């Protein structure tokens, strides 16, 4: 089984699914004379065991309460002496508490000593004890332990603390994970001086007690051996260490036999899954069943299973393109349920228990719960959505899909695209999503906290088979926004409940003795109608701890008097500080100090936890306190910490990875408000906002944590915390130095499939630095230069790389390539063109690499370089790298590819890139289509690769096989549905629409459907552009949008040529023109082609009977029937980085149009009989025109001047209206007429003029059309073009230029 799991993980290059692993926390029991053994184990053995546990998904941490370190100091304040006395009185009780918490793990060290005990003890009645001070320390410990859950200690009062611990751990309970280590000594080898000292001790008063102790320890050892407990005997520290390491390694192996954690794997998602499971388990322990809870359970279940097929293993019907391209219509059913109520009413506990109950009764239903309060670092909306996507895809597709930092999935960092992926994921199978605590959601990477909370990002129509259950505080923005939606059903949770329920909740959190003692509190609870479950839980848990330090009944009265949860927390925080804390300065703790949060280590701990990004471990907090100055007699010992944690265990809980966090948001709010003094949540605060005195305190704690983690060496902890605190402190130089440091860069670049959280925060820090004006790229280059400088004296051969000098031999080839790919991803994501220079210098090295062991890394590098050249328009160079990668891949058989998922992935990418860039001859000679068909059979279990291969096959299908192409596109849709539904599906939708257009050439019934598909693609791209923050992402989205606009215009112009369709098409062309001028430059060749097309449309619309004219112009069966706009939808301008393709195709079509028009001279004369401007609205030609056309249209301008001012429509990218209310079309002023025309030459000629290309072949028009349809044509290099012929359009005359200027002046009016 283990081998199968490892093989499966390697096959899919995915991480194993981590399960809830209970941490191994043995309690260390020994007498005071074992300090050397404890130190040796803590420093040498336990770290080894923790490393061993780390590979199994858990951790090892021994609990060692060393009371010897607890000493009173003469400089103590009165409050500290009180704390010291109270702490000693609960010595026994505290130890037994931790024995229980560590069960079933226990380590006992025994020697010749027994420990302190009461030799002549007289039993006393607990009820007769009036004053604890009247008892001895031993009696105080017995009294406190007996009153707090351990009454059995009074039955054997003459035992030592060590024996009490052994009784509780091993005699009263049974466990196979308990080990006893007996220290042996040779009593025969004694000197004469030792014998004389023993004779003197016999005469002392303590001799008899010591002798009794030796007898007792002997009996205790015999009892341990008699019970068959595992006992080991050791003579020295090394022997003890070997025994402990062997025994507890076997325990780890027995409990967690499979190695779950591997190096260079990001397990963030798996750990999040564990956090939610742990949260549910904690809520189950405190849940109280009531009438209200049963009623809510029934409502939740009715909502969840309504219209839901309980067999979630079946896919959703209707997985075609129409279901993918959903139109946001009004919902026919309510697919969202909102459970709301006041804070502390028990929403989270109720939902967690309902989720557990529902899963147990309906195991076949796909349910994904997410509790925002279960972890403090993953409360941003993008992490939440990504968690849902990963869980849904895992259930639908098997192993989790990899999320490569360098692949196309980087666009999930665009929030709107992530939502598209989410919508695709919930369409896979019937599912139930549960999101608890939505008012705590925060934004990140351009998403504001308000946007995250108001749920405006959630589409108005969810699939009927998806049920979304949310919970929120009634007064929150989330609740108010969701209540306004028509598809939301609201359920209000009554927080008060009946009296029996209140008392049950109160008793649930009390120990058995306390339940009897506080039974008399029932009448008091009845008098307080404002007690919600959170208040009752807080009061009950406090009463069990506060009685050691003060009168519990007085505390109860104070707690019951407060009106709100926040006021109750203020009282509890005040008690924690007074009873457990002390300040660094010698001054009494006052109420003012407590409220201001200015004193005490407890205050510092709470503030540090609140400020931390992902939580802090116990060891980290104690080390930070020591760094802050809590040393010597101010030192916070393990015993002090244990007492504090015992009181806060219900509210400061430990995650499965050992980090502490606030269990309830109300505690975090109280700490932020009363101790930090901030009004804005720490997680939503902006470091750039001006800081007042209270914010300075917050910044101080950020700086403390920053200083601490700068000294740490564990990468993941440093990465989680250090850059966060640098950002929040505004320390931009340090943040830039951190993310560009060689150590951090090297580690991150080696991570396989980094989680979204890891990538998101890295890119977020890059984005923050760019906004702050830092040059992150230069920092990267300087960092690499430092590496080179260290080895410059040893190496002679150097390779110059983009302004820096690197030594691949020093870095090792694999490490060099890894760093290169990481830096490429960084540059590409930031839209930096210097990536080109980077790879230009690296190319000689890449070519020289011949090691077979580096083939996978080399393939990845070659693919990355080729794609980079593809993006910047250097198609031929990109193709060169794709061909090299293809040659390297041919060394492997299909069987080899099947074994290695990484090789298969690179194979898929290479074929996809070749299909888009290689010539038809290369594809035929290398049988790429046949090879792609064969490879597709091996990727059936990976939806992403399967979708990519099907898309590649579709691109490679010859043009003549139109019906096969369309059928292939239909078969691709379900695969896309199973994949991501993001950028790849957008490409396929656009390509599929082109296939529908080809079918339109034979049947026009499909044209309307193609138009709708294009409009949906435009909406998707517009939404993506509205939230894109990366310049490269935004540029590509806008270029892609321009392509789709042109295609849609071509679809409209290929129809019935009605006035409305023509106006709409022209508006799309002008929008495309604006986008292309903005992102490709006004001199780009494609702009000239679009402008020529617009002029021809305007000239044609100058005639009165468009449909009739077009029918006459292109009679049925004519070889010229393929007009310029019929071919327009087949163009893809996304790759118009190459400056020839668009202009070539456009001008070829224009040439055909003019030739066809010249064959019908009588048509123009017929049209001249109709007076323009009357009857149907016409296009007013305002571009270049002849003198005759100018004269014919002079009356139009005269009539238009008399009309009222035209209203301007609103179009994306700040373009002016292209169609006025009379149907006149005007060029975009922003793009076309923005420059002066004083030179007499029109702007269109002076800026947009490019040489025109040859026309389509009149003999074989299908050959040219096939080139338009083929995807590879879309990525031609600048050298690919037809043989230039004489320009179709001569240079404009001065009359045309003046006419153009007149039109411009008229627009100004």
From Swiss-Prot:
Question: Which InterPro entries does the UniProt record give?
Answer: DCAF12, NACHT_NTPase, P-loop_NTPase, TPR-like_helical_dom_sf
- UniProt entry keywords in alphabetical sequence: Cytoplasm, Repeat, TPR repeat
Output this protein's name. Tetratricopeptide repeat protein 41
Q: Where are the TPR repeats?
A: 399-432, 651-684, 817-851, 859-892, 989-1024, 1042-1079
- The gene behind this protein is Ttc41
Where does this protein reside within or beyond the cell?
Answer: Cytoplasm
Q: What Gene Ontology cellular-component terms does the record carry?
A: cytosol
Which SUPFAM superfamilies would you find in this protein's record?
P-loop containing nucleoside triphosphate hydrolases
Q: Which domain of life is it from?
A: Eukaryota
Q: Which Pfam families match?
A: NACHT
Where the protein is mainly located, per its record?
cytoplasm
Organism listed in the record? Rattus norvegicus (Rat)
């Amino acid at each position: 089984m283990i081998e199968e799991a490892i093989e499966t993980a390697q096959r899919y290059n995915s991480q194993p699914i981590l399960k809830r692993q209970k941490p191994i926390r043995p309690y260390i029991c020994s007498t005071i004379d074992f300090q050397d053994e404890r130190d040796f184990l803590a420093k040498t053995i336990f770290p080894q065991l923790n490393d061993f546990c780390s590979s199994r998904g858990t951790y090892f941490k021994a609990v060692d309460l060393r009371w010897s370190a607890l000493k009173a100091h003469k400089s103590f304040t009165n409050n500290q002496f009180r704390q010291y006395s109270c702490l000693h009185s609960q010595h026994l009780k505290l130890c037994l508490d931790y024995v229980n918490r560590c069960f079933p793990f226990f380590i006992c060290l025994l020697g010749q000593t027994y420990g302190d005990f009461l030799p002549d003890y007289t039993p006393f009645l607990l009820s007769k004890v009036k004053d604890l001070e009247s008892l001895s320390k031993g009696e105080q410990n017995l009294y406190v332990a007996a009153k707090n859950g351990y009454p059995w200690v009074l039955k054997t009062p003459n035992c030592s603390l060590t024996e009490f611990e052994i009784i509780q751990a091993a005699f009263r309970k049974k466990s196979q994970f308990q080990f006893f280590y007996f220290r042996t000594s040779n009593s025969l080898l004694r000197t004469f001086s030792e014998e004389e000292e023993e004779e003197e001790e016999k005469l002392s008063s303590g001799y008899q007690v010591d002798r009794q102790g030796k007898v007792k320890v002997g009996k205790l050892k015999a009892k341990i051996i008699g019970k068959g407990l595992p006992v080991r005997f050791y003579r020295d520290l090394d022997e003890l260490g070997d025994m402990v390491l062997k025994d507890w390694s076997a325990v780890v192996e027995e409990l967690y036999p499979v190695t779950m954690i591997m190096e260079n794997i990001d397990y963030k998602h798996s750990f999040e899954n564990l956090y939610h499971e742990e949260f549910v388990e904690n809520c189950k322990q405190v849940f109280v069943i009531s009438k209200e809870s049963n009623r809510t359970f029934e409502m939740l279940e009715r909502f969840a299973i309504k219209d839901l097929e309980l067999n979630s293993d079946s896919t959703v019907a209707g997985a075609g393109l129409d279901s993918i391209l959903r139109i946001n219509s009004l919902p026919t059913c309510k697919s969202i349920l909102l459970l709301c109520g006041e804070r502390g009413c028990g929403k989270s506990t109720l939902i967690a228990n309902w989720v557990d109950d529902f899963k147990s009764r309906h195991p076949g239903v796909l349910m994904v719960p997410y509790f925002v309060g279960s972890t403090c670092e993953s409360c941003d909306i993008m992490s939440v959505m990504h968690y849902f996507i990963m869980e849904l895809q895992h259930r639908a597709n098997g192993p989790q899909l990899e999320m490569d930092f360098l692949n196309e999935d980087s666009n999930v960092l665009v929030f709107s695209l992530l939502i598209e992926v989410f919508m695709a994921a919930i369409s896979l199978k019937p599912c139930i999503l549960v999101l608890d605590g939505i008012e705590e959601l925060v934004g990140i990477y351009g998403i504001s906290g308000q946007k995250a909370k108001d749920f405006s990002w959630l589409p108005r129509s969810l699939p009927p088979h998806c049920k979304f259950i949310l919970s929120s505080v009634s007064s929150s923005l989330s609740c108010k926004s969701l209540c306004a939606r028509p598809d939301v059903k609201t359920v209000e949770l009554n927080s008060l409940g009946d009296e029996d329920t209140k008392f049950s909740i109160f008793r649930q959190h009390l120990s058995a003795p306390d339940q009897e003692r506080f039974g008399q509190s029932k009448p008091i609870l009845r008098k307080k109608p404002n007690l919600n479950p959170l208040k009752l839980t807080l009061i009950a848990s406090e009463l069990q701890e506060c009685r050691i330090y003060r009168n519990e009944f007085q505390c109860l009265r104070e707690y019951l008097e407060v009106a709100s949860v926040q006021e109750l927390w203020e009282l509890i925080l005040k008690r924690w500080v007074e009873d457990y804390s002390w300040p660094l300065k010698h001054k009494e703790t006052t109420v003012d100090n407590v409220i201001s949060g200015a004193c005490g280590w407890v205050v510092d701990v709470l503030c540090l936890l609140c400020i931390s990004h992902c939580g802090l471990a116990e060891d980290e907090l104690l080390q930070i306190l020591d760094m802050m100055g809590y040393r010597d007699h101010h030192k916070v010992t393990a015993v002090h910490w244990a007492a504090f944690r015992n009181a806060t265990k219900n509210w400061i809980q430990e995650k499965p990875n050992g980090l502490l966090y606030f269990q309830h948001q109300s505690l975090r709010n109280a700490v932020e408000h009363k101790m930090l003094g901030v009004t804005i949540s720490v997680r939503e605060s902006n470091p750039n906002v001006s800081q007042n005195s209270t914010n300075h305190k917050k910044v101080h704690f950020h700086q403390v944590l920053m200083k601490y983690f700068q000294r740490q060496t564990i990468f993941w902890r440093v990465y989680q915390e250090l850059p966060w605190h640098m950002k929040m402190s505004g320390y931009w130089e340090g943040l830039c130095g951190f993310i560009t440091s060689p150590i951090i860069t090297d580690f991150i670049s080696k991570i396989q499939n980094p989680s979204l959280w890891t990538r998101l925060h890295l890119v977020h820090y890059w984005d923050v630095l760019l906004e702050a004006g830092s040059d992150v790229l230069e920092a990267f280059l300087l960092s690499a230069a430092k590496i080179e400088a260290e080895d410059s004296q040893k190496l002679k051969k150097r390779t110059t790389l983009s302004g820096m000098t690197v030594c691949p031999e020093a870095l090792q080839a694999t490490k060099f390539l890894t760093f290169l790919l990481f830096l490429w991803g960084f540059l590409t994501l930031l839209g930096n063109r210097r990536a080109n220079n980077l790879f230009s210098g690296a190319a000689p090295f890449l070519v020289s690499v011949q090691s077979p062991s580096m083939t996978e890394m080399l393939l990845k590098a070659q693919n990355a370089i080729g794609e980079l050249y593809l993006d910047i328009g250097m198609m031929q160079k990109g193709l060169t790298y794709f061909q090299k990668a293809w040659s390297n891949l041919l060394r492997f058989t299909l069987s080899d590819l099947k074994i290695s998922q990484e090789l298969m992935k690179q194979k898929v990418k290479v074929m996809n890139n070749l299909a888009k860039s290689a010539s038809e001859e290369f594809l035929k000679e290398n049988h790429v289509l046949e090879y792609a068909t064969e490879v597709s059979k091996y990727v059936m279990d990976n939806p992403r690769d399967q979708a990519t291969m099907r898309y590649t096959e579709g691109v490679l299908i010859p043009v003549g096989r139109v019906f096969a192409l369309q059928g292939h596109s239909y078969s691709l849709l379900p695969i896309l549905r199973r994949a991501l539904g993001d950028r790849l599906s957008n490409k396929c939708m656009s390509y599929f629409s082109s296939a529908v257009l080809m079918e339109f050439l034979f049947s026009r019934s499909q044209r309307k459907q193609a138009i709708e598909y294009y409009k949906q693609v435009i909406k998707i791209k517009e939404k993506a552009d509205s939230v894109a923050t990366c310049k490269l992402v935004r540029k590509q989205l806008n270029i892609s949008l321009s392509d789709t606009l042109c295609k849609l215009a071509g679809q409209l112009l290929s129809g019935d040529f009605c006035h409305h369709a023509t106006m709409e098409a022209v508006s799309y062309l002008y929008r495309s023109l604006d986008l292309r001028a903005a992102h490709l430059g006004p001199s780009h060749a494609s702009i000239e082609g679009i402008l020529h097309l617009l002029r021809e449309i305007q000239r044609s619309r100058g005639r009165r009977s468009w449909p009739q004219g077009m029918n006459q112009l292109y009679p049925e069966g004519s070889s010229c029937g393929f007009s310029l706009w019929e071919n327009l939808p087949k163009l893809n301008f996304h790759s118009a980085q190459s400056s020839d393709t668009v202009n070539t195709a456009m001008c070829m079509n224009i040439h055909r149009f003019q030739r066809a028009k010249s064959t019908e001279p009588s048509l123009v004369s017929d049209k001249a009989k109709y007076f323009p401007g009357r009857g149907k609205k016409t296009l007013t030609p305002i571009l270049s025109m002849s003198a005759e056309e100018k004269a014919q249209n002079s009356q139009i301008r005269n009539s238009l001047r008399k009309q009222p001012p035209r209203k301007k429509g609103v179009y994306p990218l700040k373009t002016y209206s292209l169609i006025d209310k009379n149907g006149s079309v005007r060029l975009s002023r922003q793009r076309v007429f923005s420059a002066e025309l004083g030179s007499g030459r029109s702007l269109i000629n002076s800026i947009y003029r490019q040489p025109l290309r040859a026309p389509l072949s009149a003999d074989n028009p299908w050959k040219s059309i096939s080139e338009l349809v083929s995807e590879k044509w879309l990525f031609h290099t600048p050298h690919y073009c037809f043989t230039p012929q004489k320009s179709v359009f001569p240079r404009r005359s001065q009359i045309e230029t003046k006419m153009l200027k007149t039109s411009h002046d008229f627009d100004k009016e």
